[in-house]
A protein has these predicted regions:
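Hydrophobic structural packing positions in well-ordered secondary structure
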Residues: 1-2, 68, 220
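Glycine-/small-residue-rich active-site loops that bind phosphorylated ligands and cofactors
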Residues: 9, 73, 123
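A generic structural signal for beta-strand entry/edge sites
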Residues: 26, 61-65, 183-187
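Short beta-strand-to-loop capping motifs
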Residues: 31-33, 66-73
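Short, solvent-exposed polar/charged micro-motifs at secondary-structure junctions
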Residues: 37-41, 65-68, 127-129, 155
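Conserved beta-strand core positions
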Residues: 53, 64-66, 173
């Protein structure tokens, strides 16, 4: 997996770019898991297909804010240009506004009034701290937190550890992060489980240690959000 260095941008300046043009349509998307180059390639293709299409991006550790403006030349109940944009990024879109992963996760847990426990090894507590930094009330839905070194060398070991943690905490859902730092990167492994199923995820990140941890954190949060959104999630 190739990971690109994030660009630096000022969110306030990006918002100002598209102001005071009432004849245009504006939208914002948050996407996860695509490289900066891939995102730009997709946006350039859209620019060739949609009238007056302009964009700005803010890319940071696998998460990208995309700000778009375009012109609908034909009035219609269905915004075909918006459909083209959404189709281009498909399952990578996790928000059509400024909501972060942490805010979405809090909203899903609070709406369902369900509990979560988080066991962090390789991410060193960054998942829990990010969740609580944005939503102090999330503490009401966290049953247990562990920040402790351990090693599961195989998927089977991680499944066993996950099921035990789920049983011990009595939570509706658990998240466990694991992995191993290697030369120039991180082999990241994590699990998400409810009472009916366990999902194991594996990723390889190439970057310095701190950046790898940030990407691992974002990856775990993204897949946790997807799991909580699933209609068949066993609540």
């Amino acid at each position: 997996m190739i990971v690109f260095v994030p660009i630096e941008a000022d969110l306030y300046i990006l918002n100002k770019v598209f102001e005071n043009q009432p004849d245009l349509t504006y939208c914002q998307y948050k996407v996860f898991g695509l490289s900066k180059n891939t995102i730009i390639e997709k946006l350039e293709l859209l620019k060739n297909d949609i009238p007056y299409f302009e964009y700005k991006i803010l890319y940071d550790n696998l998460i990208c804010d995309i700000f778009i403006s375009y012109k609908n030349e034909e009035l219609s109940l269905i915004d075909e240009n918006k459909m083209k944009i959404v189709s281009a990024f498909n399952n990578n879109i996790f928000s059509e506004n400024s909501f972060s992963l942490c805010k979405i996760i809090y909203s899903l847990l609070s709406q369902k009034n369900k509990s979560i426990s988080i066991y962090e090894n390789i991410t060193k507590g960054k998942i829990v701290s990010s969740l609580l930094d944005e939503n102090e009330n999330l503490i009401n839905y966290i049953k247990d937190v562990k920040i402790k070194s351990f090693q599961c060398d195989s998927d089977d070991e991680l499944v066993e550890t996950t099921l035990k943690y789920l049983k011990d905490t009595g939570s509706d859902v658990v998240l466990i992060t694991n992995g191993k730092f290697v030369e120039n990167g991180l082999n990241f492994k994590f699990s998400i489980a409810d009472k009916n199923e366990v999902h194991i995820f594996n990723s390889n990140f190439k970057a310095d240690k701190n950046k790898c941890i940030e990407m691992a954190k974002n990856s775990a949060l993204f897949h946790l959000m997807k799991k909580l959104r699933q209609n068949n999630f066993a609540f």
